[in-house]
């Protein structure tokens, strides 16, 4: 009989990036890379496990923005073009490296990976990854949960109408896609403030996940630390993140991804090779970018790098999976002995860590699931919903304000680099609330304008933009996105004020920002 449980929770999210006004757009590659390196490999992993009759229980958060992109015809077409381009580059690399055995072997590996990915996407999945994820949920292996509509950082949205609208739109979109209601909701950036659980309860959410101190600093003090479920005063269950599992996988210094045998993310032929040779495969503006073809392993902390050896990296992934499992065995045995109940170790990660940032992460995950099944009997994999069925009665707590960002609170999304956006967002939210009251029961074209205004506001609220401004990565693009969506928001507002709609402009905006086709402005009714 098992003594406890491990809940692996993967949060799959990307901001909504879709630019039909351009033939090719650099930032759309974020989606293409994640498809190639994370989402399709995850589905392949699930397929292998099911074929081998290995039961597994994982929780997967699919954000509404990601689901929208997975469902978008234009992005699917562009993804196929991207794969064709990468296959062509791999063919050139096979020829270029023919006298360099170490690199030639890797060029062949990448050619095979891109070709296989294209075949799966087109022929096996019929370009419909959502259907594939749903299949594993229907079989009981996956618990798919939702997120706020555009990943808005809820503690900084200020207005209760704006907060509830983000949550309600995310839940509604999930229900439309999966024909069922989500049991859980991933709070964007795990951002929590006192009273947020009320909105979750109103939208039918059964549980959410917080950073460690969000539970540990709760009032009253949680009896079982982060190793149990709890209920908020509004009877929504909350789970806390385990710090040990976090450090061992997240940290590039102390954790597994920093092992010297693993692939070096930052050495890429997009930067290493002759400019004229690589130019057709980099940014349309001519800037060097990552292609995903990387020939070196981490090797050490110096610029010197040695060729990547996939076999050794895979051996390390198996070794690290075994180490992770051993540590969970000892951890859960101890917790079981002192808590008097079966503990749950909650291990949430960004899904894109596996395969994209940590190339061997998918292999590690597969080794771990297989080892848990065959190499031990101390704990089992579970999901938050399954654990709540086992322990339906739980202590009542009031979680602490928190996030999983740097320093654990709100500073990443509110600092000198991005604080300028909030007066504008809050003003737009007030405008939307007032317009929803003023035009309470309109139909036809005015309703169409109001619905598009909500789309623009949602897209401006995405937490990704403030995060990029803080890190300095793609910060100019992030600033432009916030400004552009707010400009479109106020342009649409003018149509209502002047009682004159420019249909050409409206259709252009609807075509560019076509997220959530069934969105209704009544979400902002008080």
For the regions a language model picked out, list residue spans one by one:
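Short, solvent-exposed turn/loop segments enriched in Gly/Ser/Thr/Pro and often Arg
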Residues: 61-66, 148, 184-193, 213, ...
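His/Asp/Glu-enriched short active-site or ligand-binding loop at hydrolase and phosphoryl-transfer sites
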Residues: 153, 205-218, 381-383
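Acidic (Asp/Glu)-rich catalytic clusters
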Residues: 2, 47-55, 128-145, 164, ...
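Conserved short loop/turn motifs at secondary-structure junctions
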Residues: 182-192, 350-354, 474
